[in-house]
């Protein structure tokens, strides 16, 4: 259902798949990774805040076609521990995926201003890179 919605919105706005970025918070991070890593063609980027990798099964078979990934997590997260992001980072990197990460000091299960700034800059860079290869 989510993939059909994404496809419909891209079509409605006459945008290529490379103009898609998925951003999620908590469970939304898990959804963004699950959908974004399986989409063909891949989105330009996935930004995940305070989440985790839902399952190793979502890792793509061809990491060369994977989106850029940024994971941001608070070191004081009481809902989804920081270890979940560290494990996700390790699994994504081991699968050959381009993953960047940031630990937000003193942040619980939320997003601070620095995390928003990093996410915005990451998306801007990913969209620029995707546009240059169209």
Give, region by region, the residue ranges found by the protein language model.
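Short, proline-enriched alpha-helix->beta-strand connector loops that line the catalytic pocket
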Residues: 17-18, 64-69, 95-98
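C-terminal catalytic histidine-bearing segment of alpha/beta-hydrolase fold enzymes
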Residues: 83-134
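A short beta-to-alpha transition loop/helix N-cap that caps and shapes the active-site region
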Residues: 53-58, 79, 111-112
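Alpha/beta-hydrolase active-site loop
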Residues: 1-12
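Short beta-strand/loop motif that positions the catalytic acidic residue
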Residues: 70-73, 77
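Primarily recognizes the serine-hydrolase "nucleophile elbow" in alpha/beta-hydrolase
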Residues: 10, 18-65
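Short, hinge-like loop/turn segments at secondary-structure boundaries
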Residues: 62-66, 118-121
